[in-house]
């Protein structure tokens, strides 16, 4: 298993294929395996790199909340590129990973050949922000009180994934 180091945190990463590199950044509640179908296809012509974000084993899981932020997520992705001596790559991210990819493009544009940013923001329209904040607070309480395994069930079945369930019932069932 390969590990990149980002500020003392070990990030599990994998590489396959050859050619111009593509860095895949996974979504919340996913991991490097989320990209397996894409990597199987693109590794025929590209050097594909995926990794588990901090907090997602086998990457390190720091206890202190100060070790998690959008700035740190960007630094982690750059650390993975540096681990493989990659100056420039296509950056592909989904949801949480899409937000990181977007910020890589804004802060480290010279490192990105292209950005593929999918579902990078949940947010809420102005009229629903208070309701959205309450839902997020309830989910955060579940994670803190019950741990990630039980909270994942709340997340998978809650309003956070209703659009996934509506658009792709088979994919949603697999996600659960």
For each feature predicted by the language model, list its residue ranges:
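Conserved alpha/beta-hydrolase catalytic His-Asp/Glu region
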Residues: 127-131, 145-176
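Flexible "cap/lid" loop of the alpha/beta hydrolase fold
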Residues: 102-107, 112-145
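Residue-level detector of beta-strand structural context in well-folded domains
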Residues: 1-2
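Active-site micro-motifs of SAM-dependent methyltransferase domains
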Residues: 30, 55, 98, 122, ...
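Conserved HGGG/HGGXW glycine-rich cap/lid loop of the alpha/beta-hydrolase fold
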Residues: 5-66
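Alpha-helical elements of Rossmann-like donor-binding domains used by nucleotide-donor carbohydrate transfer enzymes
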Residues: 34-37, 41, 72-79, 103, ...
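Active-site loop/oxyanion-hole signature of alpha/beta-hydrolase fold enzymes
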Residues: 40-43, 49-92, 96, 107
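Short catalytic micro-motifs in class I SAM-dependent methyltransferases
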Residues: 27, 95, 99, 103, ...
